[in-house]
UniProtKB/Swiss-Prot annotation:
This is Myosin light chain kinase, smooth muscle. It comes from the Eukaryota. The keyword Kinase applies. It catalyses: L-seryl-[myosin light chain] + ATP = O-phospho-L-seryl-[myosin light chain] + ADP + H(+); L-threonyl-[myosin light chain] + ATP = O-phospho-L-threonyl-[myosin light chain] + ADP + H(+). The C-terminus is deglutamylated by AGTPBP1/CCP1, AGBL1/CCP4 and AGBL4/CCP6, leading to the formation of Myosin light chain kinase, smooth muscle, deglutamylated form. The consequences of C-terminal deglutamylation are unknown. Its EC number is 2.7.11.18. GO terms for molecular function: actin binding; ATP binding; calmodulin binding; myosin light chain kinase activity. Gene3D superfamilies: Immunoglobulins (2.60.40.10). Interacts with SVIL. It comes from Sus scrofa.
Amino acid sequence: FIVLSQEGSLCSISIEKALPEDRGLYKCVAKNSAGQAECSCQVTVDDAPTGENAKAPEMKARRPKSSLPPVLGTESDATVKKKPAPKTPPKAAMPPQIIQFPEDQKVRAGESVELFGKVAGTQPITCTWMKFRKQIQES
């Protein structure tokens, strides 16, 4: 089962029983009216007894790409357009900022995986989890 959750500034994804096909790069994209930020982490799922995978998995902590405008190819055209600002703006909207990064995870098949990201910025912020450039859906 995959459970996606967003409570306030905390975005999370839980995989109840990880399978080898759950391994890969997971990306959290946080968006609001002012822009977007993203961060990613690597999930490794071992299905074989240790010894077969003698070399350590590649673990790279990726820093966020805060973007104004977003750097997402085709989507960027739509998100770059800004609404005309009112004559006296109340407060400038702050684009999302990742303040806590999801950590790389290494688990055995059948174990659970939880990834957390914490964001700051002007609400509402929507968080989307991606894997292989596809949005992850709950199951």
